[in-house]
Amino acid sequence: MTNPLGVILAGGLATRMGGGDKGLLQIGGQSLLARVRDRLEPQVAALALNANGDAARFADLGLPVVADSSDGVAGPRAGVLAGLDWAAGQGADAIVTAAADTPFFPTDLVARLVAASKGQTHPLVLATTPRTGEELKSGGRSKVNRHPTFGLWPVALRDDLRAALQDGLRKVVIWTDQHGGREALFDATPFDPFFNVNTPADLTRAEELLQ
């Protein structure tokens, strides 16, 4: 497999922070999106941003902006498909996605996702972290948390994903399980690297984690 392309998923709005683009919120004088870009770009062959609406608001990032390509489907599922369609036009085999509101994800994300895909016909891997004691008490048999916005996705299955979304697929992990998706386990200490900013309190915590 050639080095995958990267796609930042930035379709979410900061509804719990008054609206607007969550990725444009700042910590340490830099937007969340810029931090995600700087962390993912060295790991991939090329990088694009998945977002809808006026692309001009992201001009400072210097990235191509790819809008959702699936009618009637919103959220990260549509963003993954849009990224796969973009990558197909670039002649790539796979993409790695990262969420725009998660600025501390591992700097070896791509390498470890690719390593976990060894031997797969179609590379399909999601990032995971161990569940904590409290999470384990809440029920469920899984001992890990899956992070479907952080994954390695095969371009060859994009039409299959498109059909699944059009058929009403709501949880992309159902689709990854159907196609033999694997997991790459990442350490969650001293904090979960896939911690994402959803609330003003999260933004404050992110500022503290920078220190």
Task: Kindly give the residue locations of the regions a language model identified.
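Nucleotide and nucleotide-moiety/phosphate-recognizing core
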Residues: 1-172, 177-193, 200-201, 208-211
